[in-house]
Amino acid sequence: PSSAASDVYKRQQSTRAGSKGLFALDNLWDGLGALTVIKPNVKYFFGKMTMYPSYHRQGRDMILYFLNKHFGDKDKLITPMKPLEIETDKKMLENLFCYDSFKEDYKILNTEVRKLGYNIPPLVNAYMSLSPTMRMFGTAINYGFGDVEETGILIAVNEILEDKRVRHIESFVKQHPEAMKITSGAHPILTK
């Protein structure tokens, strides 16, 4: 997650873009995977997920509540100066997302957002499935960039799920074995 994530434009995330949007996300992950090989001392990716103000308010609130429940930063390492407030009744959201399990709550989130005629934004979906220990630092409106709603996140590189690591990091090494010569070759993620 970096400002590169903002370069995956809304039209590329659209479900109407079909496989073109999926390739844009794959290219983003492949680039981040390559970065971990070339710069093996990188421990964290810090960045943001962006949602557009045109997104359904209740759908947005469900996503933000879900993210905070399952990835919220309990240590309060970072907080927005002017956090975006959820408009939907929190008790209703609490009753809706009533499971301790990410998987069970995710099924509910996906179903409820689809009932509104929307999908969970692809980048949000992608980040949630990258690491079970992702941290979410809250959301704020970026008034200088079209009033988009930006949610701060942190992902520990060594906690990226194995299937994602294989797909986006190890695949880079197979295609570019010379990249391991840039470092000692003892990559902390690949030798995990």
Predicted segments with their positions:
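A conserved mid-domain beta-alpha-beta active-site/ligand-binding segment of alpha/beta enzyme cores
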Residues: D73-V124
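Conserved GNAT acetyl-CoA-binding A-motif
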Residues: T36-T50
